[in-house]
Amino acid sequence: MLALLVLVTVALASAHHGGEHFEGEKVFRVNVEDENHINIIRELASTTQIDFWKPDSVTQIKPHSTVDFRVKAEDTVTVENVLKQNELQYKVLISNLRNVVEAQFDSRVRATGHSYEKYNKWETIEAWTQQVATENPALISRSVIGTTFEGRAIYLLKVGKAGQNKPAIFMDCGFHAREWISPAFCQWFVREAVRTYGREIQVTELLDKLDFYVLPVLNIDGYIYTWTKSRFWRKTRSTHTGSSCIGTDPNRNFDAGWCEIGASRNPCDETYCGPAAESEKETKALADFIRNKLSSIKAYLTIHSYSQMMIYPYSYAYKLGENNAELNALAKATVKELASLHGTKYTYGPGATTIYPAAGGSDDWAYDQGIRYSFTFELRDTGRYGFLLPESQIRATCEETFLAIKYVASYVLEHLY
């Protein structure tokens, strides 16, 4: 029986990732102290196949920081030799990626249909958006705000008790395709909001007085690609004139210091900003919706992974928002609330200094539109599993994040503008 379960798990992992096997691949964490170290990493990236996990690209590495990256099996010896020869301190976060890829799925035989404690394929999430709206007509309605590059409908769930001219909070998940815990949280949020409405005073008040616009997966094409072809795909799946490389980083594609810093103009790079701001159908759909609802949207929350961080503007420049002190105090209180459940520690602060400079992000864009409360959440973990957070951690991750979102929402409700 045990052998059968192992075979089922291996078969699932293989089926989910289009034949990628990951055997012998490693994930390194390197301590970077100065520009010389950065140059060594840059040279490595130019001669070997390196997939940067944190930060997103070699251009975002800063002195006195760490960098996490994935290395193909055939390059691991070369990479370790270079790091040792140049006396860079490092550790191996994942010694055999295949084992961790397979372990992200619960070893139990997977039930068909939707589950809030498993990672769901897009077709399952799509069906869920219809089902959850149909089953809860007094609290949820579903709409389509646009289509993806490959022609798929982008669904938005409006969660809240019916009412006229209610203030709203916009929350999206699934910007970067490989960050699977992000869409899992948006689904959990909707379920918990409905389940606890009428039972929990705080949630009931929030849904009575606020609307939540929840976008479960923005980058649907990319998300599907991570299930069928390439588990660590990040970008959209758009094509580009004059290049065979695919995709744009949707979180470098907004008109907020577009492509000025921490983004690339090379279509082959993971942080490609696109040929123009809002060039991607997905980002344009999101931006158009927010512009149309700008008078009612009081907070913007975007859910990513990994790092355990809560960041706020600005990321496209080393400057602070006009209500920076308020954002800092709110972030401090929110991460304290989050930690109260499972002890998970988050760091917080302005994006550029807390994580890295990055232009064209949706949080900065929303803030510059006049949405005073704009936050990015980087969910679990801090690198042990990275983008491969096991399904066994979905519940705890979502429980603590739900606390955080409730805290922010209650604050916003008390500080309407």
From Swiss-Prot:
Catalysis performed (reactions): Preferential release of a C-terminal lysine or arginine amino acid
Record text on cofactor binding: Binds 1 zinc ion per subunit.
One Gene Ontology cellular component annotation held by this UniProt entry: cytoplasmic vesicle
GO MF terms, alphabetically ordered: carboxypeptidase activity; metallocarboxypeptidase activity; zinc ion binding
One Pfam family from the record: Peptidase_M14
Entry-linked PROSITE patterns: CARBOXYPEPT_ZN_1, CARBOXYPEPT_ZN_2, PEPTIDASE_M14
Source domain of life: Eukaryota
Hydrolase keyword on record: yes
Binding site for substrate: 176-179, 234, 251-252, 305-306, 356
Prodomain residues: 16-110
Sites where the protein binds Zn(2+): 176, 179, 304
The protein's Enzyme Commission number: 3.4.17.2
CDD domains reported in the protein's UniProt record: M14_CPB (cd03871)
Keywords: Carboxypeptidase, Cytoplasmic vesicle, Disulfide bond, Hydrolase, Metal-binding, Metalloprotease, Protease, Secreted, Signal, Zinc, Zymogen
Compartment(s) where it occurs, according to its Swiss-Prot or TrEMBL record: Secreted; Zymogen granule lumen
Active site: 378 (proton donor/acceptor)
Disulfide bonds: 173-186, 245-268, 259-273
UniProt similarity note: Belongs to the peptidase M14 family.
Name assigned to this protein: Carboxypeptidase B
Organism this protein belongs to: Homo sapiens (Human)
Gene name tied to this protein: CPB1
